[in-house]
Regions:
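Non-catalytic, topology-defining segments of multipass membrane proteins
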Residues: 1-178, 211, 223, 232-291
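Glycine/small-residue-rich hydrophobic helix-like segments
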Residues: 181-252
């Protein structure tokens, strides 16, 4: 009897875990496909229904997109120098490991600074949906939990397993952000930086790194060196002639999806760069960035 109950619980747990991982990957897709490349860097503009869906997904993560975008733009202005708390290079020895665990509280600190200043670029001003719905991030987290309860019931699980899948989703999402901001800025030899604790800069003195593994895990966000060199690029990386769709997707799933959306006329490449804060404003008024 006990063995049967154990097996049943394991099946329920496996279903809840799968739902949570799927939710985390959906969060990654909304983050890289809309909040990062579209909203923040203006690489393209998504069709309204797709953008609306992405906004709803991000709402469920408890994130205010204009705050995230402001923090991220400030990070680009201060990448791996004083004022950028997400840089492993500024964390001392074993900075990659330290930053992995410190990234989330450091982002929260930067976000609170942005919220306090309440200063946003012209293209990041809140609209009616933000004011009425999406700024209410606690409600978004609650709605996300309700969605998990419903998904578990549809999958044949009891509703209470929704709490487990909800936690799994948030853990996956946080893990993705932490690994991007740590290994993504681990310099010329990320693996050596993990093992020896010493981070070596790239030949040009920067610390951005391109990691195939991180890109696979985060749907394309692992190519941080290329991204910092080409922040407005739709695809994070070079696309050699003759490269097939699977190879492109393996390198940058989010960018490949964006390319397909453009071809399907569901996204429009940007022709105007976003209006952003100056480096002085980003550093002095917005505080430290960590995304």
């Amino acid at each position: 009897m006990r063995n049967r109950e154990t097996k049943n619980f394991k099946r329920k747990l496996a279903k809840a875990t799968a739902i949570g991982v799927a939710g985390g990957l959906t969060d990654f897709m909304a983050t890289t496909g809309w909040m990062h490349r579209s909203l923040t860097h203006k690489a393209y503009k998504l069709a309204p229904p797709i953008e609306g869906a992405a906004r709803a997904v991000i709402w469920g993560t408890g994130t205010r997109p204009r705050v995230w975008a402001t923090v991220h733009r400030a990070h680009h202005e201060n990448a791996d120098v004083a004022g950028d708390p997400h840089s492993p290079a500024l964390q001392g020895r074993y900075g990659v490991v330290k930053l992995f665990f410190k990234n989330t509280p450091l982002y929260s600190q930067a976000a609170r600074s942005v919220e306090k200043e309440d200063v946003f670029a012209p293209d990041l001003q809140p609209d009616e949906l933000d004011r009425k719905i999406f700024d209410k991030v606690q409600l978004g987290l609650a709605a996300s939990l309700v969605a998990h309860i419903s998904a578990n019931r549809v999958a044949g699980n009891p509703g209470y397993m929704g709490a487990i899948s909800w936690v799994v989703e948030k853990t996956v999402y946080i893990f993705g952000g932490n690994i991007v901001n740590s290994i993504g800025h681990a310099g010329a030899h990320p693996f050596n930086a993990l093992v020896t604790g010493e981070i070596s800069p790239q030949p040009d003195g920067t610390f951005g790194a391109d990691s195939k593994l991180v890109s696979l895990l985060t749907l394309g966000e692992g190519n941080q060196r290329y991204h910092h060199e080409h922040p407005g690029s739709l695809y994070f990386g070079e696309i050699p002639e003759g490269t097939g769709l699977p190879a492109r997707a393996a390198k940058d799933f989010g960018g490949t999806a964006a390319l397909l959306l453009v071809r399907m006329h569901l996204a429009e490449p940007a022709t105007v760069l976003p209006e952003t804060m100056s480096p002085e404003t980003a550093s002095a008024e917005l505080g430290m960035a960590s995304v």
